[in-house]
């Protein structure tokens, strides 16, 4: 891999030769016990990464597809407050607009989120909060623990985009009160 470009982006990522070779093997039966054992092991490992004992669902799709699935299944028809301080928060807001009454709580891109504005939105009846933990487009890490605590205090659901933080930073979904 020394002569290959080093991609310093969220994805795609360079793959070592051993990974590429493993991917070139014959496919296994996705309904068989071998696959079931592999899947169960993956879920157990992912639960540690996510900091959760709750159910996990592996989706075949992009991060945007996963965020749309979260909003479509948990926020449809609800009053949604979307915290935005970068491209992916904006994308999550645009998704939320299609599924509920979405309110954008925007900060300047790369600036800290306004938790007082979130508190006011929750007091006004917001039922769901969306946020991006690590806003890749601006390089800012948002205070997921504090945001989830505010949502929980007001009985609102917290949907967190952890696409670039899980596996690279501490994520404790259960302890913080992140729902999805």
Per-range role (PLM):
Residues 22-69, 91, 95:
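Conserved N-terminal alpha-helix of the aminotransferase class I/II PLP-enzyme fold
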Residues 1-2, 51:
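A generic structural signal for short, non-catalytic loop/turn and secondary-structure boundary residues
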Residues 2-5, 9-15, 41, 58, ...:
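Conserved PLP-enzyme active-site core in the AAT-like
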Residues 18-23, 158:
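Short alpha-helical interface patches
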């Amino acid at each position: 891999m020394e002569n290959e470009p080093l991609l310093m982006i969220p994805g795609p990522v360079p793959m070592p030769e051993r990974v590429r070779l493993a991917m070139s093997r014959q496919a296994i039966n996705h309904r068989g016990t071998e696959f079931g054992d592999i899947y169960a092991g993956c879920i157990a490992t992912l639960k540690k990464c996510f900091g959760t004992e709750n159910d996990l669902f592996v989706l075949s799709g992009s991060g945007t597809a996963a965020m749309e699935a979260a909003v479509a299944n948990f926020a449809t028809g609800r009053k949604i407050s979307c915290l935005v301080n970068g491209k992916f928060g904006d994308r999550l807001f645009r998704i939320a607009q299609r599924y509920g009454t979405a309110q954008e709580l925007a900060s300047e891109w790369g600036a800290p989120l306004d938790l007082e504005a979130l508190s006011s939105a929750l007091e006004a009846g917001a039922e769901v909060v969306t946020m991006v933990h690590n806003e890749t487009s601006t390089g800012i890490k948002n205070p997921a623990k504090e945001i989830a605590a505010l949502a929980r205090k007001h009985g609102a659901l917290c949907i967190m985009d952890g696409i670039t933080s899980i596996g690279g930073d501490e994520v404790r979904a259960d302890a913080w009160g992140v729902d999805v």
